């Protein structure tokens, strides 16, 4: 998965950086990893703002050049410091691409491109905001995780997340339809009504019984996913139907600190169940 972007002697340092910085790989590269399919794509790395500079500096040490887009600060150190010194607003889950993203930084090396995506306060918020469920997969240092494996890997279907129609969404959905996934506006009725379905009316969380988790390291595979990834594993969500032609991956954000929050499934937030175990979140 990474050999296209890094030399052999750079892989172990990358893994150390990934663990130290909490970097998560997601996007089409991870879908290719799970399916064995191959198509042209960039490598998407997701990181919280406090670790942005360290992750970008590592890419530079591997020969990647920062390639700012129009309007971006042209020096990466200054750009990352600007974001760090300007506390991001707490985003609630919204129905447009980019929710939870502070900025995207492009790094290039020849014809290879890595996108370093700075997340405001929760990486999973960004992943759960993707256009459809087939790309809701990610890789940490020690585990590869598919959040909707039965749909994505078995039936090759993808539930479209509730996003207002726009050309970008249409193009993204068409691209994955061309790659073999059937796009669904609603979960199948039998799945939505079943407590045994990943698309049912159940509260989901990373590492639950519906996820497919592949350990990537021999030693660390002895430890459960949630023990090694507590910030990710403590988030939750649910599938909801929000209109005649739309469904959504639903959650609210509960703030823990300036640069940290958790996704909380909407039924939990509405019932304020988190208060029964002593958790205190702010949502505005």
Language model features: what each stretch is:
Residues 1, 7-11, 162-170:
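Short, structured coil/loop segments at alpha-helix boundaries
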Residues 2-58, 62, 68-72:
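Active-site nucleotide-donor binding segment shared across nucleotidyl transfer reactions
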